[in-house]
């Protein structure tokens, strides 16, 4: 994948975050790697409010690319075969739960470092009040 496409995918993920999507997934030929240079960009979006769909699509259309977007907003009514295809071939661009997990891991790491620092300070530096 070239740098321009990676940058575009980061911008798509940022739009997903802005609209509080649960997940944004690249699927289709670009996810599988069998795309042509002019292939469209298939994007599946999970967990966006139906009221936000037009604005989400508008922001995608403003991205700096000549490529077309094929956008699927996944709901409970989405064809199960399509969802299975997205799950099988998809490349996750943004996942809210994964990002929360990564932040938790970072916080635990910082806490571990703080505990080590505290232990190295010794009890003499602890004051009451």
Predicted regions and their residues:
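Short hydrophobic/aromatic beta-strand micro-patches
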Residues: 44-46
């Amino acid at each position: 994948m070239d740098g321009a496409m990676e940058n575009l995918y980061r911008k798509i993920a940022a739009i997903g975050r802005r609209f509080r999507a649960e997940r944004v997934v690249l699927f289709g030929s670009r996810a599988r790697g069998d795309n042509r240079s002019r292939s469209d960009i298939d994007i599946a979006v999970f967990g966006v409010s139906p009221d936000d769909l037009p604005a989400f699509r508008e922001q995608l259309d403003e991205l700096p690319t000549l490529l077309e977007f094929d956008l699927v907003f996944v709901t409970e009514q989405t064809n199960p075969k399509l969802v299975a295809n997205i799950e099988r071939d998809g490349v996750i661009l943004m996942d809210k739960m994964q990002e929360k997990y990564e932040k938790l891991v970072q916080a635990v790491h910082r806490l571990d470092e703080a505990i080590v620092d505290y232990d190295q300070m010794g009890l003499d530096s602890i004051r009451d009040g």
